[in-house]
Amino acid sequence: GLYLQAELPMWIKDVGQYPARRDYFEKEMYAILEEYGNHPSFILMCNGNENEGNFDVLEDLVKKAQKYDDRRLYSASTARTHTASDQYYTSHVTSKGWITVYEGRPSTDWDRSKETEIDCPVIAHETGQRCMFPNFDEIKKYTGVLVPRNFEVFRERLARNGMLHQADDFFKATGMHTELQYKEVNEALLLNRKSGGFLLLGLPA
């Protein structure tokens, strides 16, 4: 099954700069714990994604959450900084090296044991964040603010260079390559007895 990590809606570079915003996050944290706290898969709680700034503020939130509801594990932020209050750490990298492999180079070196051997469980962040060529047939499925303008840019570039007829081949080839990479990276983490697992980017409700 899947375990859920809930996050505060915090993805900022100046944590702690605005007291009113900090108060909002604390209220939101309590609201999340109150509303979803009994969900059996809700085992991890994090203050937000790739935050930067005053981590004392984030540690304070972690300690308050732990005191309020100790049924799950808490972490200050995904990526960027590992804090003393972290009961687990989700990141691309630890103090011992990279745990999320982004490079597409051919390789047989998938051992991430050393990199995940720190003082708390380590979960690899964004292992599925891989690029592939777009499917231009999907453009017509979206309207309004969701129209994929970036797809239109790539389609125009292909047409300008006389390669538009290859678009479907590019889509299929890069999709297969992405699938192979995703499989190898996640299997490497599953085979690593020191790994705490890997984090999927999102789970639609």
For the regions a protein language model found, what residue spans apply to each?
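Generic intrinsically disordered, low-complexity segments enriched for polar/acidic and small residues
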Residues: R71, S85-D86, I99, F151, ...
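Substrate-binding clefts and catalytic carboxylate motifs of secreted carbohydrate-active enzymes
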Residues: M45, P106-A205
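Short, flexible loop segments at the rims of nucleotide/cofactor-binding pockets, characterized by
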Residues: R21-D23, T100-Y102, M176
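Short, low-complexity, polar/charged sequence segments that are solvent-exposed and flexible
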Residues: Y24-F25, K63-K67, V93-K96, K141-L146
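Substrate-binding cleft/loops of secretory-pathway carbohydrate-active enzymes
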Residues: G53-Q66, A79-E117, M132-F136, L190-N192, ...
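Active-site mouth of glycoside hydrolases
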Residues: G1-D86, E117
